[in-house]
């Protein structure tokens, strides 16, 4: 696997592959990789001839008082895991390479509506940062297909909307969430949790499962949400939001909607965890 910070080197290699009629898949990450990321690479290998991965802790998507400086940087371990998984090209730019004029003078991409609620309401500017860096990386790598985890469901929807709105010739693939044996969704931020907190945090997925079952049986969504919030409080969480949405467009769920998704964000101690569950209502 070849690792570079150089935009020109990435473009040269991708151009060579495409001239040979070969396809390119892309997996953007912030590093500190876990099995969920490796699964994205494995899936990417099924969909293209070559896999490019990026590692960039994007300062534009972190708000004030968030964990930018504390976010783990584990490049050597990440490189070893990616090489073992079959990635061929790793792009590891610095903020100065990505934002040479500084973030305040950087052209940005913003997806209206989707970016402003749920995680967007709790983290203003977050999805502007996500959309901007993903669009920029797409322009650098020029992939045929890009893969993202469904754990970040709202992010996946924002990226799909951006690609559609800007007519980018890239297929966006969502990959199912990879979980610990307890049910806790794998996340780089799980490393902030103590072992006891990890066991407590598994209640988040159990709560989502119980909500989906109750809604599928016809219970009123507001009542289900209220009960679930009480459950999370009792389990030691401080809920940020808990919302049932149409899975296709993230509108508030209507009685006629069949394909639904429950989205949740909650703090366990000082660590903010997110999860979601898609299900069908009869």
Curated annotation (Swiss-Prot):
The reaction proceeds by a bi uni uni bi ping pong mechanism. PANTHER family: CYTIDYLATE KINASE/PANTOATE-BETA-ALANINE LIGASE, PANTOATE--BETA-ALANINE LIGASE. The lineage of its organism: Bacteria, Pseudomonadati, Pseudomonadota, Gammaproteobacteria, Alteromonadales. This is Pantothenate synthetase. Its main location: cytoplasm. It is found in: Cytoplasm. Beta-alanine binds at residue 61. Its EC number is 6.3.2.1. GO terms for cellular component: cytosol. NCBIfam families: cyt_tran_rel, panC. Belongs to the pantothenate synthetase family. (R)-pantoate binds at residues 61, 155. It comes from Shewanella loihica (strain ATCC BAA-1088 / PV-4). Keywords: ATP-binding, Cytoplasm, Ligase, Nucleotide-binding, Pantothenate biosynthesis. ATP binds at residues 30-37, 149-152, 178, 186-189. Pathway: Cofactor biosynthesis; (R)-pantothenate biosynthesis; (R)-pantothenate from (R)-pantoate and beta-alanine: step 1/1. One of its GO terms (molecular function) is pantoate-beta-alanine ligase activity. HAMAP family: PanC. It catalyses: (R)-pantoate + beta-alanine + ATP = (R)-pantothenate + AMP + diphosphate + H(+). Pfam families: Pantoate_ligase (PF02569). Homodimer. One of its GO terms (biological process) is pantothenate biosynthetic process. It is an enzyme of class 6 (ligase). InterPro entries: Cyt_trans-like (IPR004821), Pantoate_ligase (IPR003721), Pantoate_ligase_C (IPR042176), Rossmann-like_a/b/a_fold (IPR014729).
């Amino acid at each position: 696997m070849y690792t570079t910070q150089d935009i020109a080197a990435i473009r040269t290699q991708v151009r060579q592959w495409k001239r040979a009629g070969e396809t390119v898949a892309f997996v953007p990450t912030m590093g500190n990789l876990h099995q969920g990321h490796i699964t994205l690479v494995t899936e990417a290998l099924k969909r293209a001839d070559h896999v490019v991965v990026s590692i960039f802790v994007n300062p534009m998507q972190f708000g004030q008082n968030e964990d930018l400086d504390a976010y783990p940087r584990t490049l050597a371990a990440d490189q070893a895991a990616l090489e073992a998984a079959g990635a061929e090209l790793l792009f590891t730019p610095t903020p100065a390479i990505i934002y040479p004029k500084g973030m305040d003078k950087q052209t940005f991409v913003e997806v209206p509506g989707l970016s402003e609620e749920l995680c967007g309401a709790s983290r203003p500017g977050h999805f502007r940062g996500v959309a901007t860096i993903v669009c920029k990386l797409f322009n650098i790598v020029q992939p045929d297909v890009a893969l993202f985890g469904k754990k970040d469901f709202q992010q996946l929807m924002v990226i799909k909307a951006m690609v559609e709105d800007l007519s980018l010739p890239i297929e966006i693939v969502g990959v199912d969430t990879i979980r610990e044996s307890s049910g806790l969704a794998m996340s780089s931020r799980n490393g902030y949790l103590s072992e006891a907190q990890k066991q407590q945090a598994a209640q988040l997925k159990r709560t989502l499962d119980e909500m989906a079952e109750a809604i599928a049986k016809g219970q009123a969504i507001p009542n289900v949400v209220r009960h679930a919030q009480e459950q999370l409080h009792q389990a030691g969480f401080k809920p940020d939001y808990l919302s049932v949405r149409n899975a296709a467009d993230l509108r508030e769920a209507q009685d006629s909607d069949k394909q639904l998704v429950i989205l949740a964000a909650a703090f366990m101690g000082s660590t903010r965890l997110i999860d979601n569950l898609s299900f069908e209502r009869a």
